[in-house]
Amino acid sequence: VGLLSRRRPTPPAGAVPAGGPEMDFPRPAGAGARQSRMPWRLPDEPAISGIAADAVTVGALTVRAASLVGPGHRCAEPAQHRQDAYRLGRDPGRRFLLAAVADGMSDSSRSHLGANVAATALVARLRADLGRGADPDGPALFLDAARQMSGMAAQQKVTENDVRAAALAAAVPVEPAPDGTRPVWLSWLADVSAWLRTGAGWTRLTGTDKEGLDQDVLTEFLPFHPGRTRTARVSVPPGAVLALATDGIGDVLAGGAAPWFAERWAGPPHIASFVADVGYDARGRLDDRTAVVIWCDR
């Protein structure tokens, strides 16, 4: 009787679609994409997970991170691997939150591996440099990641062209300066971006808005161009909300959905809600999407 009492009632016939239950993601721009309502498929080869997520507190920082395979990749048969990646960490002295976000290029057959190696290498090198008291060096950081990506390509018996990725690394002070601000160190290559929540929208801290017919064509990426890495130190105000994102999120923060995300991420949401936000459904937005959002003093 005890076992029977814990059984869920059998749903009526026809209650669940033949292809499985639909997964409804929020639609910040109204119309959704047809692919978002299609079943998720598997790649032919064993794959990294289609969804990765973390919810952590590091000192006075609250962090939500999520990476999802995009509708255009997950509904194909066979599906494509999630080509985005992120990593979180902290320095040995626990003074900095370290984060890296990487976006594998769709026309590189092993870019999912390249993105994961890049994100891991960037955080590891940042941690090592800060641990020995050195200032972060963007070009050296990205050169180290490029070498590891090249080594992985050789191990996989593929070319460096098969593992290309864009990337961004950040070091965020756990505690604020006496005036409440935080000097955030950022280093990036290509269109992975950093954003600061400002009122009902977002201000871009790294990268440039996409324009023209070739707006999605990258001319710089790892492992080929670590010397083109750009670096900035940005002072963020008390209570700031900082977002690090691949273009699957960055493109909508630059567009009409920016107020929706600003409202949703005014404070740290439950991780399940955050994953749903990152997995948003919008017509024409089919790419993988990744966001690491940091709330200061929350």
What are these regions (language model features)?
Residues T120-A154, W260-D281:
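Helix-loop-helix
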Residues L205-G207:
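Extended, polar/charged low-complexity intrinsically disordered and coiled-coil segments in eukaryotic
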Residues S108-R110, L196-R197, V252-A254:
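Short helix/loop capping segments that flank catalytic or ligand/cofactor-binding pockets
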Residues E77-R82, T159-A165, R283-L286:
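A short catalytic or substrate-binding loop motif that flags glycine-/basic-rich loops and adjacent residues
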Residues A100, W188, L242-L244:
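Residue-level marker for buried hydrophobic side chains located in beta-strands
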Residues P11-A124, V192:
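N-terminal entry segment of metal-dependent catalytic domains or homologous docking segments
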